[in-house]
């Protein structure tokens, strides 16, 4: 009975908001709330953009989701010094072109359609002290299905980020996807609101190597709590190997990935790839490109 109180599958909508947008994050099992930085942090921990080392950060990520569905994330963050940091993000989930079929024309009517879900967000964060950041995003959600079916919604996300100051330890907390409901036909569905907590720190560190550990808890409003753990090994700040695991998720299990970071004309460029296992559903791969300047 106690466990059953958490089980509310199908009670929320706009599920694409739950999909990991970063190959680096996905490779670490999604345990990225206290690690995220730059434009990627607009999704995981908006407060972290206040600690950007560069003035601009731009990211382009692509996820090959199930059933030939594409999930993309593009974002830019700008550090405006003492005025805080600002960001814009766009998340898109879209299907391939599909045929319109009816009981009388099961092979198709000659019409085609796409189904798409979109999130456009604006973020802001500011340093409160040299170790504490606060931030958030305001988001516009748009869902488009066949013909005249369109729905709009709005959400906000708020987060806090704390640099412990010992062995690179960081703690973060976030409330995500808090906002208006969406109506499908005659049913009203809530947003997939979640509460997330993350803690990360250096396990090992030397002049040219480090091993970073991360653990997170994600409590969605439509399911039980999910535990996330991840590791990242860095070599010469150029090559990165990552692994992670989901605890309590209905399908997600292990994940792994790698990344490289290099300097081109005094501009840093990062490229990442990841693979995530979803049991009988298969493997999901992600790729990403990050520009820091």
Can you say where each PLM-predicted feature lies in the sequence?
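Subset of outer-membrane beta-barrel
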Residues: 3-293
């Amino acid at each position: 009975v106690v466990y059953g109180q958490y089980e509310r599958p199908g009670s929320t909508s706009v599920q694409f908001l739950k999909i990991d947008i970063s190959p680096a994050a996905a490779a670490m099992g999604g345990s990225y709330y206290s690690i995220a930085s730059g434009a990627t942090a607009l999704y995981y921990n908006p407060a972290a953009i206040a600690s950007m080392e560069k003035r601009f950060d731009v990211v382009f990520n692509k996820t090959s989701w199930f059933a030939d569905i594409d999930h993309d994330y593009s974002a830019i963050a700008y550090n405006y010094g003492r005025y805080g940091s600002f960001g814009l993000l766009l998340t898109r989930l879209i299907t391939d072109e599909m045929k319109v079929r009816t009981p009388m024309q099961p092979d198709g009517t000659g019409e085609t359609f796409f189904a798409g879900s979109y999130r456009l967000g604006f973020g802001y964060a500011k340093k409160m002290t040299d170790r504490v950041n606060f931030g958030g995003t305001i988001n516009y959600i748009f869902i488009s299905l066949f013909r005249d079916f369109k729905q709009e919604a709005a959400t906000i996300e708020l987060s806090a980020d704390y640099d412990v100051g010992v062995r690179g330890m960081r703690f973060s907390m976030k409330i995500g996807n808090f906002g208006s409901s969406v109506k499908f036909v005659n049913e009203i569905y809530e947003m997939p609101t979640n509460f997330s907590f993350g803690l990360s720190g250096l396990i090992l560190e030397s002049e040219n190597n480090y091993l970073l550990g991360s653990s997170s808890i994600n409590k969605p409003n439509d399911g039980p709590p999910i535990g996330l753990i991840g590791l990242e090994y860095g070599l010469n700040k150029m090559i990165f190997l990552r692994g992670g695991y989901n605890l309590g998720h209905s399908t997600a299990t292990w994940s792994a990935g790698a990344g490289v970071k290099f300097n081109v004309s005094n501009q840093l460029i990062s490229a990442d790839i990841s693979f995530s296992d979803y049991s009988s559903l298969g493997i999901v791969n992600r790729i990403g490109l990050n520009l820091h300047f």
